[in-house]
Curated annotation (Swiss-Prot):
Residues 159-172 have a biased composition (Low complexity). Keywords: DNA-binding, Nucleus, Repeat, Stress response, Transcription, Transcription regulation. It holds the Pfam family Myb_DNA-binding. Plants over-expressing MYB15 have improved drought and salt tolerance. This is Transcription factor MYB15. SUPFAM superfamilies: Homeodomain-like. The gene is MYB15. Residues 115-172 are annotated as: Disordered. The keyword Transcription applies. GO terms for cellular component: nucleus. GO terms for biological process: response to cold; response to salt stress; response to water deprivation.
Amino acid sequence: MGRAPCCEKMGLKRGPWTPEEDQILVSFILNHGHSNWRALPKQAGLLRCGKSCRLRWMNYLKPDIKRGNFTKEEEDAIISLHQILGNRWSAIAAKLPGRTDNEIKNVWHTHLKKRLEDYQPAKPKTSNKKKGTKPKSESVITSSNSTRSESELADSSNPSGESLFSTSPSTSEVSSMTLISHDGYSNEINMDNKPGDISTIDQECVSFETFGADIDESFWKETLYSQDEHNYVSNDLEVAGLVEIQQEFQNLGSANNEMIFDSEMDFWFDVLARTGGEQDLLAGL
């Protein structure tokens, strides 16, 4: 939608109104009213735009308009209404009959605003502030607290070897530990936690140095000898098992031969019985 042409291009006048123009406008409005400000200049025969006619009537030519300065009561009313309505000048003018919104706005900015000691202009809203940001000091405190809690948690979950055997000057209790050696016996470690003393471990406890010194060549020889004996025994068992299997096969073969021989003897006895004996058999031959 394009912008309407200005008054000069339309052949309309601009500038101050003449008394003749004021008389024409007042007479037309009193007779016909002002239902349509855009069509009013043409109907009234004025070379003015509708906006100029409206402002001239509302601010100067209207019969009930008050002339002169604002009274003390009107100024107090403007201040109280401005605290409630703000810069809604037309709404304030509706509460003050005979005063226009333009006059009220002018008197506020020129006189009334300066009289207010506690007046503070509205600060522009800054929409560039990031939500959820914390002050720098609070962020530093929270980060230091988090690192401190993490370090305390690491110390409590992963104690070092020095902390196990370290002694505090405020405790004097006796603690004991039990270690299991390689041969199944248990040895106790007594630690006397006295102020200013270093905890000592009994010489009877098993350490890596004494354990290595107790192992000599005889230990390794006995171990190897026991392994050799185990291998010899296993070999003997394997040989004995093979011999037993061989004997079982031999016994099975001899039993089969006996069964075959017995079956052959039965066959010939049966033949002799059918032919009538050995003599008949020889005679037949």
